[in-house]
């Protein structure tokens, strides 16, 4: 993916929390990160200066994607799962497999409330995971004060300090009814599932009372408890408090296109997603059902235990496709939120697609139209651009590139070895190339360009126009692209007499001309270098006394390349099996050639 395409994607990043996945040239995910605001965080990688390790990462990024979440906490939890899933090499690799903590009510005769990093199928009640260890412990401390479950891992022989603090019922000494535990467990579950708001309001009242009574230390403690509740109790739509495998579907449609996003929830966590975009031709709901049918035909898409679908989808039809899976159309709660989130990401992806298309249209077709307006000619939908390349007239070549509606048409590129011109004569070279190109266009009835661009000034433009008009009888607009002292596109010359076409340097039409000039220059230089690499060894040795075809082959076999021969001393050349006087002549000839060619590569 080009850097320009990345810049276009950066411009479309949403102002929302989420996770981003950086990819290298092979499409491998090399880094996963999270952001409170995706737009700001992802853009920061491609602007400003970075330390060495970040620079190494940025140098390998050629593409990225992102997943929008409902909160920053959710982004953090998703980031954990994505890193575990993809193991990106630029992410920190922990030595152990610790994850974020859960609050657990144990399944014991005398249950405990504990913090654990291990989630097991032991009939305990788990809540989380929580992204902030300190805050999770603070919430547990609040619960310990409100609900006096036992604290000891094994029952002691006598009551402990917690009993005297009112934080334990002391089952080690007293009988505690199971109904009492059930009552407390139900209240804890309610607290962790939203009932914390009542407790939070009570704490706020206590904090205000403590502040009014000048008990600032106590007020600060209440404040910390309130902050802990707010931090840890934020809803986490992407994590389910069970181990059920689910696929969550959401889709969006616009302008005849559909985007389907599938969230893969495994062991209760979102670990991956699938994004598909395609045109639909029938009813959207029907095409969506077709997609699901095809989706589960793939060997790597094993139907999970449950599938969540949006409203208005024929769940019975889906059930027929995956008969052993439970089909659910959620109506409320976290399950409904997950479907909404899949839809939200599908809508964002589809909007991004069309915005990228619009931006591409603006920089191609739109730029071509405005270029024609600025020049006072019909829209130049087909533009053919020419450039010459040689070194002191040796191996002169020319190249032509074609742009259709502002986009390169590489099948229409052409290369030319100059046949009739000796020495560095750009005007004569341009005449030959224009003659050869458009004589063939006439003969083979090929498409005529709407505009010819010449990489050069008045002399090259006049040479091209003279051949077109006076030799071939063609009336095609010809313009020239001039460069500044830094070899950058600076002006467009057109008209009779030639005038500078007024173009804003930050306009899309000017950028289009830059791309055309850079592309034809690249193409010409590449062709010239290829030609030189094939003929350079032979041509440089031509004319040296004592060096015939046999010794040329001997030198080539010994040194392997022209570069090594150019760097060789007389003694090293002699070691190739040639007489001393011949070695001296070869060294003298190559030294003179190097001096002549140094820093003189030109168009």
UniProtKB/Swiss-Prot annotation:
Segments forming domain GIY-YIG: 15-92
Compartment(s): Cytoplasm
Lineage: superkingdom: Bacteria
Gene Ontology MF: a single term: excinuclease ABC activity
UniProtKB keywords: Cytoplasm, DNA damage, DNA excision, DNA repair, Excision nuclease, SOS response
InterPro entries: DisA/LigA_HHH, GIY-YIG_endonuc, GIY-YIG_endonuc_sf, GIY-YIG_UvrC_Cho, RuvA_2-like, UVR_dom, UVR_dom_sf, UvrABC_protein_C
Pfam families (UniProt xref): GIY-YIG (PF01541), HHH_2 (PF12826), UVR (PF02151), UvrC_RNaseH (PF22920), UvrC_RNaseH_dom (PF08459)
Record bears the keyword Cytoplasm: yes
Alphabetical list of SUPFAM superfamilies matching this protein: C-terminal UvrC-binding domain of UvrB, GIY-YIG endonuclease, RuvA domain 2-like
GO biological process assignments: nucleotide-excision repair; SOS response
One GO cellular component, as annotated: excinuclease repair complex
UVR domain sequence ranges: 197-232
Chief site of localization: cytoplasm
The keyword Repressor appears for this protein: no
Family label: Belongs to the UvrC family.
Function per UniProt: The UvrABC repair system catalyzes the recognition and processing of DNA lesions. UvrC both incises the 5' and 3' sides of the lesion. The N-terminal half is responsible for the 3' incision and the C-terminal half is responsible for the 5' incision.
Quaternary assembly: Interacts with UvrB in an incision complex.
Name of this chain's protein: UvrABC system protein C
Originating organism: Listeria monocytogenes serotype 4b (strain CLIP80459)
């Amino acid at each position: 993916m080009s850097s320009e395409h990345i810049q276009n994607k950066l411009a479309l990043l949403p102002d929302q929390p989420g996770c981003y996945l950086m990819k290298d040239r092979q499409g491998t995910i090399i880094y996963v990160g999270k952001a409170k605001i995706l737009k700001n965080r992802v853009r920061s990688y491609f602007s400003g200066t970075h330390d060495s390790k970040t620079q190494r990462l940025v140098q390998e990024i050629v593409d990225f994607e992102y997943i929008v979440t409902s909160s920053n906490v959710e982004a953090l939890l998703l980031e954990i799962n994505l890193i575990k899933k993809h193991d990106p090499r630029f992410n920190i690799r922990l030595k152990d497999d610790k994850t974020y903590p859960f609050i657990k009510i144990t399944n014991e005769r005398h249950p405990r409330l504990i913090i654990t990093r291990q989630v097991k199928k032991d009939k305990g009640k788990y809540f989380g995971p929580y992204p902030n260890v300190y805050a999770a412990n603070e919430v547990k401390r609040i619960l310990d004060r409100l609900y006096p479950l036992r604290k000891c891992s094994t029952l002691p022989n006598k009551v402990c300090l917690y009993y005297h603090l009112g934080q334990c019922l002391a089952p080690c000494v007293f009988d505690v009814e199971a109904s009492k535990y059930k009552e407390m467990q139900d209240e804890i579950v309610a607290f962790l599932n939203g009932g914390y708001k009542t407790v939070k309001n009570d704490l706020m009242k206590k904090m205000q009372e403590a502040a009014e009574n000048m008990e600032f230390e106590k007020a600060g403690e209440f404040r910390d408890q309130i902050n802990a509740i707010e931090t840890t109790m934020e809803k986490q739509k992407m994590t389910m408090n069970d181990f059920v495998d689910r696929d969550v579907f959401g889709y969006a449609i616009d302008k005849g296109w559909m985007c389907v996003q599938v969230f893969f929830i495994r062991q209760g966590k979102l670990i991956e997603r699938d994004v598909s975009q395609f045109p639909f031709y029938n009813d959207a709901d029907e095409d969506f059902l077709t997609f699901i049918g095809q989706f589960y035909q793939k060997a790597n898409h094993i139907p999970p235990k449950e599938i969540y679908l949006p409203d208005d989808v024929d769940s019975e039809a889906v059930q027929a496709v995956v008969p052993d899976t439970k089909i659910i159309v959620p109506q409320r709660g976290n399950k409904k939120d997950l479907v909404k989130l899949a839809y939200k990401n599908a809508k964002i992806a589809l909007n991004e697609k069309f915005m990228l298309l619009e931006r591409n249209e603006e920089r191609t077709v739109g730029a071509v139209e405005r270029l024609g307006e600025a020049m006072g000619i019909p829209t130049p939908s087909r533009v053919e651009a020419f450039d010459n390349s040689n070194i002191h007239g040796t191996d002169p070549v020319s190249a032509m590139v074609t742009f259709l509606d502002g986009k390169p048409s590489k099948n229409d590129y052409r290369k030319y070895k100059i046949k009739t011109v000796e020495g560095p004569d750009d005007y004569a070279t341009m005449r030959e190339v224009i003659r050869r190109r458009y004589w063939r266009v006439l003969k083979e009835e090929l498409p005529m360009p709407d505009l010819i661009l010449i990489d050069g000034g008045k002399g090259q433009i006049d040479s091209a126009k003279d051949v077109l008009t006076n030799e071939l009888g063609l009336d095609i607009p010809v313009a020239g692209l001039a460069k500044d002292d830094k070899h950058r596109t600076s002006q467009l010359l057109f008209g009779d007499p030639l005038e500078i076409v007024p173009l804003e340097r930050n306009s899309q039409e000017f950028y289009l001309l830059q791309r055309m000039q850079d592309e034809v220059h690249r193409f010409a230089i590449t062709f010239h270098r290829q030609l030189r690499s094939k003929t350079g060894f032979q041509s440089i040795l031509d004319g040296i006394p004592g060096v015939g075809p046999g010794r040329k082959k001997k030198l080539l076999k010994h040194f392997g390349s022209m570069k090594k021969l150019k760097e060789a001393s007389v003694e090293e050349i002699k070691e190739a099996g040639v007489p001393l006087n011949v070695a001296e002549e070869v060294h003298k000839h190559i030294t003179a050639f190097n001096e002549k060619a140094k820093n003189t590569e030109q168009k």
